[in-house]
């Protein structure tokens, strides 16, 4: 289907040229064909993004600073190319073009996050509401709806307000629960008449483990003996404290939405979790147990409270009094606090049992007593992508979904991220940089794995590819590219469809 509105001439030419290239570029011989028509009726396909990685306009439109602004500017050495998200993919200015790209591919939905500090520059109601920020997101939502694309909104994708970090250490304080709830309520009031799917938090595991255990992500806290070279932190306590407060903020926000807005707005609300799949390093009971502990410490950390009202038994046993406890009231509040679960899957690891530590230097990174690796006996679990942590293992996608089905009562699931990156090779001519056949293979095989899980009863209702565009990839900066559309960082952030964009367009034909 043609995109509404005129496409820039260069972009149109690229589409026409690549339509020829893409038609035969990826040889899927040996793999069953897959398309939209393979999936259940009403299944949603979309792409995903996040505010700090995409928007830019960091100092425009009344936006206040987030912890990622501070982290990238004060610690450029922690970013591979010393870059930041000041401009990012410039979706703050180019959002209409982004929506045209989605529409042209035939995408049903777009998952994006709201920048908390674009709504509340100082993080709380006391600092005032930024009307320019409200206007920007209204414009984006209305543009999406005018092109037939459903908005799925994430309220928090790691860019918490620096003002709240300064005031009470952000998510280390229970004070953030009410401030987050106030922020969420503004979004429900302003956008909820048109937005029918809400996600409170994106990947609390990543935020808490990288932000408070290793110090590799904002706010850059860790114990002094960790490799993150942090000036402050406690890797054995703070990750658990921060994520405890995220779970409580999530649950309070869900209660608010269900009590005041859901009946009128008729939307749904959930949370996005991430998990790798874990394969025992060898066929031993100790390594089987290590794989189970690994998934408990990454996924069960959040899923167990949401389903059962408490943390996994393995975490309670190994972390002890460093793991916060839920009161009876909190347990009841968190349990069942979702309409759906967003699930992000990228990769798998082998899990190898570790003996108990000496009790010194406690850290989330070693509490699970599982050594995680992508390589066994010199052989990787799957092809390695540009990011050193990302090994391609489609089978794990199916295994994870069936694990969720069998262990957590088969909740409604949306795959809110799935994707792969390549290196940003600045020497490649544009036409070569658009040939991302490895990404097409990744999507083809993962969609087949997803389809297999659905046929075996997994209750999955939608799939969002990560990502619509190349973008600022956190500590990797702009050294890797996850987009199905190429962003030219040297020429006004122009967008060019990669082969995978054409593949998706063909896949999504109705």
UniProtKB/Swiss-Prot annotation:
It comes from Oryza sativa subsp. indica (Rice). A beta-D-glucoside binds at residues 53, 157, 202-203, 346, 417, 466, 473-474, 482. This is Beta-glucosidase 12. It comes from the Eukaryota. Gene3D superfamilies: Glycosidases (3.20.20.80). GO terms for cellular component: extracellular region. Disulfide bonds join 208-243, 222-230. It catalyses: Hydrolysis of terminal, non-reducing beta-D-glucosyl residues with release of beta-D-glucose. Pfam families: Glyco_hydro_1 (PF00232). It is found in: Secreted. Residues 1-24 form the signal peptide. Its EC number is 3.2.1.21. Hydrolyzes p-nitrophenyl beta-D-glucoside, p-nitrophenyl beta-D-galactoside, p-nitrophenyl beta-D-xyloside, p-nitrophenyl beta-D-fucoside, p-nitrophenyl beta-L-arabinoside, cello-oligosaccharides and laminaribiose. GO terms for molecular function: beta-D-fucosidase activity; beta-galactosidase activity; beta-gentiobiose beta-glucosidase activity; beta-L-arabinosidase activity; glucan exo-1,3-beta-glucosidase activity. InterPro entries: Glyco_hydro_1, Glyco_hydro_1_N_CS, Glycoside_hydrolase_SF. Transmembrane segments: none annotated. Keywords: Disulfide bond, Glycoprotein, Glycosidase, Hydrolase, Secreted, Signal. Belongs to the glycosyl hydrolase 1 family. GO terms for biological process: carbohydrate metabolic process. Glycans are attached at residues 122, 229, 361, 371, 425. The active site is at residues 203, 417. The keyword Signal applies. PROSITE patterns: GLYCOSYL_HYDROL_F1_2.
């Amino acid at each position: 289907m043609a995109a509404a509105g005129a496409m820039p001439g260069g972009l149109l030419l690229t589409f026409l040229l690549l339509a020829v290239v893409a038609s035969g570029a990826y040889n899927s011989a040996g793999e069953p064909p897959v398309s939209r028509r393979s999936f259940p009726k009403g299944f949603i396909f979309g792409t995903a993004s996040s505010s700090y990685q995409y928007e830019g306009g960091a100092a425009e439109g009344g936006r206040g600073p987030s912890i990622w602004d501070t982290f990238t500017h004060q610690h450029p050495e922690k970013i591979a190319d010393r870059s930041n998200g000041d401009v990012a993919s410039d979706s703050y200015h180019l959002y209409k073009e982004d929506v045209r790209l989605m529409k042209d591919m035939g995408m049903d939905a777009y998952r994006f996050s709201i920048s908390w500090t674009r709504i509340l520059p100082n993080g709380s109601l006391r600092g005032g509401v930024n009307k320019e920020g409200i206007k920007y997101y209204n414009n984006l939502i209305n543009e999406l709806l005018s092109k037939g694309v459903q908005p799925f909104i994430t309220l928090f994708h790691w860019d918490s307000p620096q003002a709240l970090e300064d005031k009470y250490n952000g998510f280390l304080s229970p004070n953030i629960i009410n401030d987050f709830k106030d922020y969420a309520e503004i979004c429900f009031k302003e956008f909820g008449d048109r937005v029918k799917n809400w996600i409170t938090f994106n990947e609390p595991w990543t935020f808490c483990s990288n932000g408070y255990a290793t110090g590799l992500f904002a706010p850059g806290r860790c114990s002094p003996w960790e490799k993150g070279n942090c000036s402050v932190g406690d890797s054995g306590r703070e990750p658990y404290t921060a994520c405890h407060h995220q779970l409580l903020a999530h649950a309070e926000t869900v209660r608010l939405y269900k009590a005041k807005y859901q009946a009128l707005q008729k939307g749904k609300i959930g949370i996005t979790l991430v998990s790798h799949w874990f394969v025992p390093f060898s066929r031993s009971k100790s390594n089987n147990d290590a794989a189970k502990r690994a998934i408990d410490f990454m996924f069960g950390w959040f899923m167990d409270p949401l389903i059962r009202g408490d943390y996994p038994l393995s975490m309670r046993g190994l972390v002890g009094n460093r793991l916060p406890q839920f009161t009876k009231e909190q347990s009841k509040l968190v349990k069942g606090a979702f309409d759906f679960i967003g699930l992000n899957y990228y990769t798998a690891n082998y899990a190898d049992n570790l003996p108990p530590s000496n009790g010194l230097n406690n850290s989330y990174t070693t509490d699970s007593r599982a050594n995680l690796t992508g390589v066994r006996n010199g052989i990787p679990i799957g092809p390695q992508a540009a990011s050193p942590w990302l090994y391609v293992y489609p089978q794990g996608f199916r295994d994870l979904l069936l694990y969720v089905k069998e262990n957590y009562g088969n909740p409604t699931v949306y795959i809110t991220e799935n994707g792969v990156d390549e290196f940003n090779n600045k020497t490649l001519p544009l036409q070569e940089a658009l040939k991302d056949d490895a990404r097409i293979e990744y999507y083809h095989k993962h969609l087949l794995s997803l389809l297999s899980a659905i046929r075996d009863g997994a209750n999955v209702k939608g799939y969002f590819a990560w990502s619509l565009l190349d973008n600022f990839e956190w500590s990797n900066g702009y050294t890797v590219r996850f987009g199905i559309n190429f962003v030219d960082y040297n020429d006004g952030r122009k967008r060019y469809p990669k082969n995978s964009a054409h593949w998706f367009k063909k896949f999504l034909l109705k």
